[in-house]
Amino acid sequence: MTSSSSNRPFSHRSPNTFLTYPQCPEQPEIISQRIWDLCSHWTPLYIICAREAHRDGNQCLHALIQTEKPVRTTDSRFFDIDGFHPNIQSAISPNKVRDYITKEPLALFERGTFIPRKKSFLGNSSKGNSDKKPSKDEIMRDIISHATSKQEYLSMVQKSLPYDWSTKLQYFEYSANKLFPDIQEEFINPHPTSEPDLLCNESIKDWLQPNIYQVSPQAYLLLQPNCYSIDDAISDLEWLDDLTSKQIMEQGSAASTSSVQQGQENLHGPEA
């Protein structure tokens, strides 16, 4: 799992973590100590770090750290050291990763005792000690130890325990969700912050006129017998609108729809 190439939320969970620091000038011993300290919560057991030279002249650092408990982090910058950001992967085969790191190192540092990957029970019953069939507990322990994602976990269960997978899939899905919980994306406010403008008179007025004040001049003529023309009705309604707006501004609080409508019924125009 890389740390930056995907738009999906970052998540890393593995007892065998393979790190590559491009163009990092630090010594392998210093980087190893920093990584060891970063993983102290998961009880580090072994680390190896080596400097490798590329054909283009650039150098990088490779590191493999093994922990007693799987390293869990959703922070893609967790392993950053002095501004150097590594590529982060789960070492499915720590044996092969270690062989790669020790291939042609310019400098190498090692601490602890390397833990070879245990022989997997998945699909290997025909080789070696085939007389002893592993129990389901042993198979599941192996799957939990090596799976690095929800999809890989379910795929390994399906491959090694097909009958249980087909009859108890909902239980395996539940355990997969617990082992590899979905990462909640950080909330991004769709409304960018701006200078406070709580009144917004122009915008509110544009919405207020067609949505709240729905008294038509024709309806006003029916309610007010002293009003004799459409022009008089429009004039009265405009006066009511201005008066109500001034009262709201003076009181410093918004009037409710019901009180506005009641004011429209009781107040008389300037010609009444």
Curated annotation (Swiss-Prot):
PROSITE patterns, sorted: CRESS_DNA_REP
UniProt motif (LXCXE motif, interaction with host RBR1) ranges: 198-202
Motif (RCR-2): 60-65
Annotated Gene Ontology cellular component terms: host cell cytoplasm; host cell nucleus
Active site residues of this protein: 100 (for dna cleavage activity)
Chain positions covered by the region annotation Transactivation: 221-230
Motif (RCR-1): 18-21
Full protein name: Replication-associated protein A
Organism for this UniProt entry: Maize streak virus genotype C (isolate Set) (MSV)
Source lineage: Viruses, Monodnaviria, Shotokuvirae, Cressdnaviricota, Repensiviricetes
